């Protein structure tokens, strides 16, 4: 299932990783004006949104779909094996 985060969730994801819109543009190869439009509630092609999601996921974020909980969101994903290392 493709994740389609809202404008608020996209802004929150960008804040979590500490990126400017320019940083996100450089990593995702999506133009800064398009990112700005999306963060202000505008529409975009599915491929464009997925490029942003992929960039954030590569930084360790996980998107929470509205169907998974009582609301959508974004959070840090625990990298595989990290918990095991912390327990040693």
Where are these regions (language model features)?
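Residues that mark the N-terminal boundary/hinge immediately upstream of a DNA-recognition element
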Residues: 6-9, 20, 45-48
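Recognition helix of helix-turn-helix/homeodomain-like DNA-binding domains
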Residues: 29-44
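Helix-turn-helix/homeodomain-like alpha-helical modules used for DNA recognition
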Residues: 61-88
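Short basic helix-loop element that most often maps to the first helix and adjoining turn
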Residues: 9-23, 81-84
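Conserved hydrophobic/aromatic packing and binding residues within compact polymer-binding modules
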Residues: 10, 24-25, 35-38
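DNA major-groove recognition helix of helix-turn-helix/homeodomain DNA-binding modules
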Residues: 46-64
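Alpha-helical residues within the helix-turn-helix
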Residues: 15, 26, 40
């Amino acid at each position: 299932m493709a994740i389609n985060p809202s404008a608020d969730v996209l802004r929150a994801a960008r804040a979590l990783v500490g990126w400017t819109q320019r940083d996100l543009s450089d990593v995702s190869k999506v133009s800064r004006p398009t990112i700005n439009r999306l963060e202000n509630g505008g529409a975009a092609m599915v491929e464009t949104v997925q490029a942003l999601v992929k960039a954030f996921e590569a930084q360790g974020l996980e998107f929470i779909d509205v169907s998974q909980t009582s609301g959508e969101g974004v959070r840090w994903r625990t990298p595989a094996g990290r918990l095991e290392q912390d327990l040693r």
